[in-house]
């Protein structure tokens, strides 16, 4: 919301700088998104008196001698039609910044710096300026809309600051307001807060007016939907004289982004911005039946609004009708059939409180919004409805544009505009704050906020102003508003008074990572060194993910916690596995053209002890790794698993496993010292097809709650071997069903000198018989007591081959 400092000063004597006021607003809970001067791009502009003005032959230019007061007299060349000797105009000195305009002299194209120049042989030491070049409009300053030089007041002194004269030195606060403070959606609302912050009296806008004896006989107002319109006020104004608004009103409206239309319409917009009350004015000559009725629209009923758009309504929409037809879409926009025109002679002013939810739904459903609907959506109180009407009628008299009749109707089924009493415990207020604010200080602060407090022992009695609907007690026995009172106290007292303290139940611990955190970080570093990128997903997944991975009905993964109010259906379950998120992530990467890669995630899965929940679920820290692409395989995933094992100085073993979403022959469970910690395998082909995945994908999940037992395992130093290692590469032909792990286990059991076994090739087809495969291993033998010669190593190989043949029927490939 835009708030001009000059307008704010109308109600509060502000004796601090704009920057200091910005700080006070921030400390009081109001975020100032931007603070800027109206003429922030304009600099070094002073009043100049043209002493002589001579035409330059054969051009439209004039060469002028300009008196700029303390800045001296300078020669300036000017092409404006209205330049003349004796005239006073804005002078941009050398080095000044002004707006550059297009050829139409109206369109701003940027900011330019004035330099010394030469035109038709005449030197020019500055520039005489138009209103557009200063960023001014006709609404901001009278005469600025003229397509020529901006004329300064006759009493303006040469050398005087033009920004001060034209109001370009005014400051603007762009304030972001929270939803719980609709009372601050106006200049007066912010002024109330500034008054309390600076402890200065609030000067209320004038609301006095005189009613004549003239009446609109028989006029009546009925509200058929009081749930949607708890208050509706109408007041008749006659002998209306349509015309322009005074310059001060047009300027203020322009500063907050509203263009002047006419005096009557401008008054409604002015009250909206000043008081926060949306107003509307109907041309009485177009109201039929001498009545106004507030009702729900009929099904299919139509209205053409002020922007000449036709809308078809339903009973969900609230309309303002005369005796025959709808004349306004309540809270959103008036009807074209009753708009204020140049010929308007009498008007009916409307000030109302409409239900915020209904206005919001109507605006969304019809795709129609306005300044008024935005204000109603945030909430309007009955106090502002009454004050807004009084202020509008005062302005009618002040501007001399009409006479106020004694005909007015006020239908009220809502709250009283009188302050409502509320009592809270001072002890409870201080307990919320965690500090001891003296009772007399609380009284002082709440008095500044216009709550008229009194104290009796521990009981603080407040008179809640009607415009503070966020603080109004919800019943006679409402004693639970002390947190709201605490908020009011501390934002005025100062948040800096709250000291950092530990909660009573908090435990003080030494800094640094614990064992689990250190182990987790080491694990992540290990995966990164193997080319994997960390990713993070929501802690939720979709029921369709469980179906995608084909989990049986009784699978533990389907025993998931349902979110009561999910973001959407795809994030409606707490994750019981990380695999679904990882497989979907691989699919998304492929769709973005990333056809290979390695990803990992460390996150919690949530295993409920029972459903519906009666106690907290078991949260288990889990690692999920995903690989995909032409270079990835079951064995590269096994290499990643072995890399994790090596980093922990443990050995993983693998056994075949069946998983609903993994390839039946390329899936294993992972064991660490005989304890199952997870699984890995190739994603099943049918799942890859459903996700349109082009390359093979592999996924691994490890339970870090179990694996963390080995995070701080002490590593023992193994001395370097005294004798040279011996390596042999052997290829074996075997049944397809035999696993790599079975071969490795058999070799290690047969020979105690085997240090390392690496699988480096798998081959099928060609000379390999049907149902068979070839697996090639590199086997490393390490002597312990003496060096091995070739003959002894060959004996090892022969025994290994014999044992493999005996156990599995394996043959050494020629």
Give the ranges of each region predicted by the language model.
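Phosphate-backbone binding interfaces of nucleic-acid-interacting proteins
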Residues: 1-211, 348, 367, 371, ...
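A carboxyl-terminal module marker
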Residues: 2, 447-455, 461, 470, ...
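Glycine/proline-enriched, intrinsically flexible loops and inter-domain linkers
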Residues: 5, 55-57, 198, 202-301, ...
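Conserved mixed alpha/beta core segments that line enzyme active sites in large multi-domain catalysts
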Residues: 33, 47-76, 255, 262, ...
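Beta-rich nucleic-acid/ligand-interaction surfaces
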Residues: 39-43, 209-213, 463, 507-508, ...
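Mobile "lid/hinge" segments at catalytic clefts and subdomain interfaces of large enzymes
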Residues: 120-129, 133-135, 144-148, 163, ...
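Extended, well-folded interaction surfaces typified by the phenylalanyl-tRNA synthetase beta subunit core
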Residues: 189, 422-595, 728, 780-782, ...
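Terminal amphipathic helices with adjacent charged low-complexity linkers/tails
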Residues: 198-223, 400-429, 436, 485
């Amino acid at each position: 919301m835009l708030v001009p400092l000059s307008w704010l000063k109308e109600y509060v004597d502000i004796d601090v700088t704009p920057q200091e006021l910005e700080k006070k607003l921030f400390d009081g809970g109001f975020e100032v998104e931007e603070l800027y001067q109206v003429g922030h791009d304009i600099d070094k502009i002073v009043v100049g008196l043209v002493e002589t003005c001579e035409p330059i032959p054969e051009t439209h230019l004039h060469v002028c001698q300009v008196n700029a007061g303390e800045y001296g007299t300078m020669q300036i060349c000017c092409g404006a039609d209205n330049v003349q000797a004796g005239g006073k105009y804005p002078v941009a000195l050398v080095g000044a910044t002004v707006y550059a305009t297009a050829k139409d002299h109206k369109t701003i194209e940027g900011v330019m710096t004035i330099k010394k120049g030469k035109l038709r042989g005449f030197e020019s030491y500055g520039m005489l300026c138009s209103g557009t070049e200063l960023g001014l409009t006709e609404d901001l300053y009278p005469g600025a809309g003229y397509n020529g030089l901006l004329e300064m007041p006759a009493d303006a002194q040469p050398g005087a600051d033009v920004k001060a004269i034209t109001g370009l030195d005014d400051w603007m606060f762009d304030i972001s307001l929270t939803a719980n403070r609709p009372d601050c959606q106006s200049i007066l609302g912010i002024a109330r807060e500034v008054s309390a912050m600076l402890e200065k009296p609030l000067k209320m806008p004038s609301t006095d007016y005189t009613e004549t004896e003239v009446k609109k006989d028989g006029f009546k107002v009925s509200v058929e939907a009081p749930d949607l319109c708890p208050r509706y006020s109408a007041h008749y104004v006659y002998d209306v004289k349509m015309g322009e608004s005074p310059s001060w009103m047009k300027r203020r409206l322009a500063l907050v982004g509203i263009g002047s239309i006419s005096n009557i319409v401008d008054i409604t917009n002015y009250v909206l911005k000043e008081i926060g009350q949306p107003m509307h004015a109907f041309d009485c000559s177009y109201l039929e039946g001498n009545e106004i009725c507030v009702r729900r629209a009929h099904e299919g009923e139509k209205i053409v609004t002020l922007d000449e758009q036709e809308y078809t309504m339903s009973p969900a929409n609230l309309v303002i009708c005369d005796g025959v037809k709808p004349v306004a879409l309540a809270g959103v926009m008036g009807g074209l059939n009753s708009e204020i025109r140049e010929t308007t002679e009498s008007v009916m002013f409307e000030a109302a409180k409409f239900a915020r939810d209904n206005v919001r739904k109507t605006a969304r459903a019809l795709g129609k919004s306005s300044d008024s609907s935005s204000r109603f959506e945030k909430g309007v109180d009955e106090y502002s409805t009454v004050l807004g009407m009084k202020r509008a009628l005062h302005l009618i008299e002040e501007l001399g544009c009409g006479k106020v009749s004694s005909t007015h109707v006020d239908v009220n089924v809502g709250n009283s505009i009188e302050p409502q009493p509320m009592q809270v415990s001072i002890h409870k207020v201080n307990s919320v704050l965690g500090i001891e604010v003296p009772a007399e200080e609380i009284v002082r602060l709440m008095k500044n906020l216009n709550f008229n407090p009194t104290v009796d022992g521990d009981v603080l009695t407040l008179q809640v102003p009607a415009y503070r609907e966020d603080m109004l007690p919800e019943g006679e026995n409402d004693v639970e508003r002390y947190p709201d009172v605490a908020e009011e106290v501390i934002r005025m007292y100062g948040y800096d008074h709250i000291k950092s303290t530990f909660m009573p139940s908090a435990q003080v611990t030494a800094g640094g990572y614990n064992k689990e955190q250190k182990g987790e970080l080491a694990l992540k570093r290990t995966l990164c060194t193997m080319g994997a990128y960390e990713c993070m997903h929501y802690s939720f997944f979709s029921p369709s993910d469980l179906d995608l991975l084909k989990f049986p009905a009784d699978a533990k993964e389907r025993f998931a916690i349902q979110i009561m109010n999910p973001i959407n259906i795809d994030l409606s379950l707490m994750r019981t596995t990380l695999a679904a998120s990882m497989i979907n992530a691989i699919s998304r990467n492929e769709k973005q053209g990333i056809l290979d890669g390695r990803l990992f995630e460390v996150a919690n899965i949530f295993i409920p002890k029972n459903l519906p929940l009666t106690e907290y679920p078991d949260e288990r820290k889990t690692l999920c790794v995903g690989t995909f692409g032409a270079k990835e395989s079951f064995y590269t995933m096994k290499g990643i698993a072995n890399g994790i094992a090596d980093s922990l100085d443990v050995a993983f073993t693998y056994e075949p496993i069946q998983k609903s979403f993994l390839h039946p022959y390329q899936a294993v469970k992972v064991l660490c010292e005989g304890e199952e910690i997870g699984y890995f395998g190739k994603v099943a082909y049918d799942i890859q097809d459903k996700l349109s995945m082009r390359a093979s994908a592999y996924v691994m999940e490890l339970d870090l709650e179990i694996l963390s037992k080995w995070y701080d395992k002490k590593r023992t130093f193994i001395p370097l071997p005294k004798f040279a290692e011996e390596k042999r590469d052997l290829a074996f032909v075997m049944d397809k069903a035999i696993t790599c792990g079975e071969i490795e286990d058999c070799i290690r059991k047969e020979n105690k000198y085997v240090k390392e076994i690496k699988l480096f090739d798998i081959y099928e087809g060609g000379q390999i018989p049907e149902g068979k495969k070839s697996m090639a291993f590199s086997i490393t033998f390490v002597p312990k007591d003496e060096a091995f010669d070739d003959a002894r190593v060959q004996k090892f190989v022969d025994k290994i081959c014999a044992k493999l043949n005996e156990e599995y029927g394996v043959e050494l490939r020629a």
